[in-house]
Amino acid sequence: MGGTKRLYYEDAYLTEFDAEIVERTEHEGKPAVVLDRTAFYPESGGQPWDKGELGGASVLAVLEREDGAILHVLDRPAEGARLRGRVDRPARFDHMQQHTGQHVLSQAFWELLKGETLSFHMGADISTLEIGLKAASDADLYRAEDRANAVVWEDREVKTYFVPEDRIGEVPLRRPPKKQGLLRGIAARPDFIQGDEQ
């Protein structure tokens, strides 16, 4: 995986780190930097970017470029060549819980109703999940909710791992990855793997 080293893959709970600026640029008129490494998660797959500070500047957006670099958009120019990053811990943990919850609920709809997840949007106050069903009764919705809650109450360990592109065919995915390259997999039990292109 090229570009910025993604520290959140090594430790999803890491919220403080030091990094070198490798590029200074602008994004929509705001100062931005690319770092050699980051704990800031970029906007991806319906999950918002991490909030926080870099060298005292507020992080306004975190975006992944096509070259794999992570762009950190700031409220003011970064000073110096080395920065201390601080990710907003409560917001990060909220995003992690909501994202995992979405995977669990999506799987419940798939198992019970063969309802494919079409889109997911995570907001500050509400998250939405669009399921591809022509019709669903209230009873269907309650069954999916009960199934998802049962999985949550089982307190399953969530594991992440990477699968090289040439071995993706060995992974039981519901649909093919949208991107080429390394696939990040998330599993809450041996027979269910949720793929996430990274």
Provide a role label for each language-model segment.
Residues 1-198:
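A glycine- and charged-residue-rich anion-binding loop/surface
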